[in-house]
Amino acid sequence: MEDLYRKLPSVDEILREEKINEVLKFNKREVVKNCIREVLERYREKIRRGEVKKIDIEKILEDVVSQIEEKKKMSLRRVVNGTGIILHTNLGRALFPPQVKEHLLDIAFCYSTLEYDVEKGERGSRYSHVEKLLCELLDVEAALVVNNNAAAVLLALNTLAKGKEVIVSRGQLIEIGGSFRIPDVMLQSGAILKEVGTTNKTYDFDYINAITENTALLLKVHTSNYRIVGFTHDIATEELVQIGRKYDIPTMEDLGSGVMVDLREYGLPHEPTVQEVVKAGVDIVTFSGDKLLGGPQAGIIVGKKKYIDLMKKNPLTRALRVDKLCLVSLECVLRIYRDSNPVEAIPTLKMLTAKPSQLYEKAAILNKLVLTIPKVKSKVVEITSLSGGGSLPEESLPSYGITLEVEGFDTEDLERRLRIRDIPIITRIVDGVVTIDVRTLLEGDEEVILHALEEITGVCQ
């Protein structure tokens, strides 16, 4: 083993190799040196584990060149989503409609009217680009956009209830993902949490009995990422609004996924729409931009002007503000809601409402193409998709996909081979077989899958 360590070339020796000199013509010296160190460290580790029997200089040089090429790849890059999870948090959640692309590029590479009022020739507000649209679509007095829904809740609580009590049902103290919990957000806001009711049952008198002179807000949190079923009771939004008005206390509802389309029209379960909650009379409503709305990551706050004006003046708003790329993409999405059919134009909603017959046809076409590749077996199968992103937690969507088996690879090997490509193909393992759910495949993904399988089978030969 010691002999193998001694035979490993030094960084300087590798730098003098002709193959590396060629690489240095197109890469910074420090980058190349770092890659050499990383490769040598890997070899030392392999020697420690007894995996290296002899030192092959040519192989080391090849590994260095490969490491340099790997460094050039973007870390954040496109993937093929074959999981069937529409709002896959790890894969970027909502996809933008195609109409967003042109405007996004325009604003990214040109100066813009971000905070400039062209009519008055003076400074404007960055929020005006989407506030008018939100007010028009939702029939609200005012709106504000921050960088995510947790930030929206934080800002609202900090503005309206810092140092005072916020009453919320015990059954609504949710965790919103990444171990962030409503009580923790409330603590950071400076508001004082006052839990009422029980996990499964909360009544109007629970809220009424908890009201004191220190009560600043009545909060309702929509449990969009789970359901409590069975022996349960919760008060309706309208009832909470009535209590708030009777005791002159503002009401707020965190809707989470923030759908603006009645999903019952497409055979899906009822998910409260933003419009319904606004119509119920809630003073402040918060929801996400990148879930069922189908836009960018954002926390959207709508409601009474007097409360939102206070939030706009809060120094936290500056810390939580969104950039021009978020605003232009959100504006495009909101214009689709106003001017056309969002279910046809917004990818999230289009995938969510896709008919099983459409998905079967899509799977059959892909299966036919895959079967032309030697050493690959596949078939069309019925599977279930999920909406993901903490929305529609009880709903499994009937879908279709194809199974993949490649001669010479077991299930785990094939899944990994597809996953580690330049364009990663993320699949599911269903009943021990690699499976691609076609619901979440985009135009052009089929070609990526076919190319990957052709290369993989070439390796097998």
From Swiss-Prot:
Q: Which GO terms describe its cellular component?
A: cytoplasm
The keyword Metal-binding is annotated on this UniProt entry: no
Q: Which cofactor does it need?
A: pyridoxal 5'-phosphate
Mind listing the GO biological process terms from this record? Answer: conversion of seryl-tRNAsec to selenocys-tRNAsec; selenocysteine incorporation
- Top enzyme category: transferase
Where does this protein chiefly localize? cytoplasm
> Mind listing the UniProt keywords for this protein, alphabetically?
Cytoplasm, Protein biosynthesis, Pyridoxal phosphate, Selenium, Transferase
| Localization | Cytoplasm
EC number(s) reported in the record = 2.9.1.1
The highest taxon in the source lineage is Bacteria
Which pathway does UniProt place it in?
Aminoacyl-tRNA biosynthesis; selenocysteinyl-tRNA(Sec) biosynthesis; selenocysteinyl-tRNA(Sec) from L-seryl-tRNA(Sec) (bacterial route): step 1/1
Record's catalysed reaction(s): L-seryl-tRNA(Sec) + selenophosphate + H(+) = L-selenocysteinyl-tRNA(Sec) + phosphate
**Cysteine pairs bridged by disulfides in the record:** none
- For whether the record's keyword set contains Transferase, the answer is yes
N6-(pyridoxal phosphate)lysine is found on K291
Q: What are this entry's molecular-function GO terms?
A: L-seryl-tRNA(Sec) selenium transferase activity
Checking NCBIfam families in the record gives: selA (TIGR00474)
Entry's family note: Belongs to the SelA family.
Briefly, what is this protein's role? Converts seryl-tRNA(Sec) to selenocysteinyl-tRNA(Sec) required for selenoprotein biosynthesis.
**Name under which the protein is recorded:** L-seryl-tRNA(Sec) selenium transferase
Which species does the entry assign this protein to?
Caldanaerobacter subterraneus subsp. tengcongensis (strain DSM 15242 / JCM 11007 / NBRC 100824 / MB4) (Thermoanaerobacter tengcongensis)
* Gene name of this polypeptide: selA
